[in-house]
């Protein structure tokens, strides 16, 4: 099997450790930083880092490429193994003993160009700026208006990222939906809405505000169009992986009080 290993820039040592182990059984055809430019074509991409590293690596992957993450960051929703579990991973790889999750991208079109996001796209004001009136038009429906600091449009993958911190729901990865979450809205009852993923969303503000794609500032714009992309990656998990256990252990959600 031809494998690419991509790592966070300060995790080269951990990457070399995995390369040494993996290369005993498979051909490592690429080894480098996840944020380096260029596409990666391999049978499997191994990522060393946290969720941010996985997001960068996913955009370099060809459609449908399986990816597996080794945790070397903080929360690690998109990582599946620890470095200590390398032998366990190799055994799972020999037998292809994985659970697979399909994680799809959203496509964002604006005057800044076309972008892909696995987590979310955010339009928000500068810290020193005033609140902004934002119009959100969902395909086949009339517009919604928010007077807020901004708005986040996220995938199910991104529901445990920025959207969660501003009161959005946790969405299981298998759900085919998009989440629209206003940031610090003026009206308390203005909450997140969840829509079918095949609906296009147009967001327009009264003035130029910051656009962030997967947390990375790309510039300022007034208008974006967001829709589900055809691009996707496959995240490999150990066979016993359970999403509820993950959100309970990492977020404390649904934890039993003793």
UniProtKB/Swiss-Prot annotation:
Catalytic activity: NAD(+) + ATP = ADP + NADP(+) + H(+)
Primary enzyme class: transferase
GO molecular function: ATP binding; metal ion binding; NAD binding; NAD+ kinase activity
Domain of life according to the entry: Bacteria
Residues annotated as binding NAD(+): 51-52, 56, 119-120, 130, 149, 160-165, 184
InterPro entries: ATP-NAD_kinase_N, ATP-NAD_kinase_PpnK-typ_C, NAD/diacylglycerol_kinase_sf, NADK
Any one cellular-component term (Gene Ontology): cytoplasm
UniProt cross-references to SUPFAM superfamilies, sorted A to Z: NAD kinase/diacylglycerol kinase-like
EC assignment: 2.7.1.23
Sorted UniProt keywords: ATP-binding, Cytoplasm, Kinase, NAD, NADP, Nucleotide-binding, Transferase
Cofactor: a divalent metal cation
UniProt-annotated location(s): Cytoplasm
Free-text function comment from the UniProt entry: Involved in the regulation of the intracellular balance of NAD and NADP, and is a key enzyme in the biosynthesis of NADP. Catalyzes specifically the phosphorylation on 2'-hydroxyl of the adenosine moiety of NAD to yield NADP.
HAMAP family named among the record's database cross-references: NAD_kinase
Family to which the UniProt record says this protein belongs: Belongs to the NAD kinase family.
PANTHER family: NAD KINASE
Protein name, entry field: NAD kinase
Organism in which the protein naturally occurs: Thermotoga petrophila (strain ATCC BAA-488 / DSM 13995 / JCM 10881 / RKU-1)
The gene coding this protein: nadK
